[in-house]
Amino acid sequence: MSKTIAINAGSSSLKWQLYQMPEEEVLAQGIIERIGLKDSISTVKYDGKKEEQILDIHDHTEAVKILLNDLIHFGIIAAYGEITGVGHRVVAGGELFKESVVVNDKVLEQIEELSVLAPLHNPGAAAGIRAFRDILPDITSVCVFDTSFHTSMAKHTYLYPIPQKYYTDYKVRKYGAHGTSHKYVAQEAAKMLGRPLEELKLITAHIGNGVSITANYHGKSVDTSMGFTPLAGPMMGTRSGDIDPAIIPYLIEQDPELKDAADVVNMLNKKSGLSGVSGISSDMRDIEAGLQEDNPDAVLAYNIFIDRIKKCIGQYFAVLNGADALVFTAGMGENAPLMRQDVIGGLSWFGMDIDPEKNVFGYRGDISTPESKVKVLVISTDEELCIARDVERLKNTK
């Protein structure tokens, strides 16, 4: 038996889950927020208890020390030596990493170099990896890449219709993201349907603050909505999703607050989407409250959101030449029945029909009617478990 920590580190946060492996039992989980800011918050959940501390945590190394000390302090482990592996979620692996890998100095350097593809994510992941390697140098660290699952896309799918020199010289192409989530829910969908994954055509919709849709053919990603960066695709919580690229120079010319392309991209990443259009929030619960109040901006934001998701799902029916099931996952995908209802309502031509009661009352599993030609599934994603499994598989290979 061994204990494995799955880590999802952001620029100012560190989310974690401790597993007993190979039993896949969750022993504890938590998050450290506001790293590098005043009044950082460390939350630990274990044995039905919740412990919260407000501290000043200056960097990721300090955050990791606090996490490990908390595990001992709360009696979750007796010593650091009980931990036999650490797995790290890394958003961008580019073309370098087609599967999960054991971390070494070269791998860490390459992850930092790939930050250009995920500037909001890779630097935080690298900081988390470095912190664990400094504090637990003898423990195997494994990187699990969001992009790895999408390396099965064909060249005509991942290349953009621009001169090929930009791919050859600068590796500009579609990489995708959320691959670990899409892989996991596809595997779970096959179990739920009682059919081999290798026989299924699935559309998986990861709808959280970030949104990505993937076309899965016989267990492999053949297309996905996120692109060169996670900014592409349908509308998201704070991200615009796809826009006409000519808007970028136009806004620089017109708006004195936007001085260069970086300013515009920052606006598209952090101040757009549901939040930017509604002026209320990036949280679908707040948007739905606005719908109840007939707030016109909330209504507009919601309608754009539904429209963009329907269009993306529809195009993947064409890519796959039909589908056996549509899978909803992640925060909104799992917990926003109105959103699911309105998305499916616009796709009824494809033969989808959902059971209203199962949809509304938080049912996990098949929410479609018996007559539905395409099954509609709600599956809770578990990226942390996928990470822990890869650590278990790779920890003796370094």
UniProtKB/Swiss-Prot annotation:
<feature type="binding site">
    <location>
        <begin position="206"/>
        <end position="210"/>
    </location>
    <ligand>
        <name>ATP</name>
    </ligand>
</feature>
<feature type="site" description="Transition state stabilizer">
    <location>
        <position position="239"/>
    </location>
</feature>
<dbReference type="GO" id="GO:0008776">
    <property type="term" value="F:acetate kinase activity"/>
</dbReference>
<dbReference type="GO" id="GO:0005524">
    <property type="term" value="F:ATP binding"/>
</dbReference>
<feature type="binding site">
    <location>
        <begin position="283"/>
        <end position="285"/>
    </location>
    <ligand>
        <name>ATP</name>
    </ligand>
</feature>
<comment type="subunit">
    <text>Homodimer.</text>
</comment>
<dbReference type="InterPro" id="IPR000890">
    <property type="entry name" value="Aliphatic_acid_kin_short-chain"/>
</dbReference>
<keyword id="KW-0460">Magnesium</keyword>
<feature type="binding site">
    <location>
        <position position="8"/>
    </location>
    <ligand>
        <name>Mg(2+)</name>
    </ligand>
</feature>
<keyword id="KW-0547">Nucleotide-binding</keyword>
<dbReference type="InterPro" id="IPR023865">
    <property type="entry name" value="Aliphatic_acid_kinase_CS"/>
</dbReference>
<comment type="pathway">
    <text>Metabolic intermediate biosynthesis; acetyl-CoA biosynthesis; acetyl-CoA from acetate: step 1/2.</text>
</comment>
<dbReference type="GO" id="GO:0006083">
    <property type="term" value="P:acetate metabolic process"/>
</dbReference>
<dbReference type="GO" id="GO:0000287">
    <property type="term" value="F:magnesium ion binding"/>
</dbReference>
<dbReference type="GO" id="GO:0005737">
    <property type="term" value="C:cytoplasm"/>
</dbReference>
<feature type="site" description="Transition state stabilizer">
    <location>
        <position position="178"/>
    </location>
</feature>
<keyword id="KW-0808">Transferase</keyword>
<keyword id="KW-0963">Cytoplasm</keyword>
<feature type="active site" description="Proton donor/acceptor">
    <location>
        <position position="146"/>
    </location>
</feature>
<keyword id="KW-0418">Kinase</keyword>
<dbReference type="InterPro" id="IPR043129">
    <property type="entry name" value="ATPase_NBD"/>
</dbReference>
<comment type="similarity">
    <text>Belongs to the acetokinase family.</text>
</comment>
<keyword id="KW-0479">Metal-binding</keyword>
<feature type="binding site">
    <location>
        <position position="15"/>
    </location>
    <ligand>
        <name>ATP</name>
    </ligand>
</feature>
<keyword id="KW-0067">ATP-binding</keyword>
<feature type="binding site">
    <location>
        <position position="89"/>
    </location>
    <ligand>
        <name>substrate</name>
    </ligand>
</feature>
<dbReference type="GO" id="GO:0006085">
    <property type="term" value="P:acetyl-CoA biosynthetic process"/>
</dbReference>
<dbReference type="Pfam" id="PF00871">
    <property type="entry name" value="Acetate_kinase"/>
</dbReference>
<protein>
    <recommendedName>
        <fullName>Acetate kinase</fullName>
        <ecNumber>2.7.2.1</ecNumber>
    </recommendedName>
</protein>
<comment type="function">
    <text>Catalyzes the formation of acetyl phosphate from acetate and ATP. Can also catalyze the reverse reaction.</text>
</comment>
<feature type="binding site">
    <location>
        <position position="383"/>
    </location>
    <ligand>
        <name>Mg(2+)</name>
    </ligand>
</feature>
<dbReference type="InterPro" id="IPR004372">
    <property type="entry name" value="Ac/propionate_kinase"/>
</dbReference>
<feature type="binding site">
    <location>
        <begin position="331"/>
        <end position="335"/>
    </location>
    <ligand>
        <name>ATP</name>
    </ligand>
</feature>
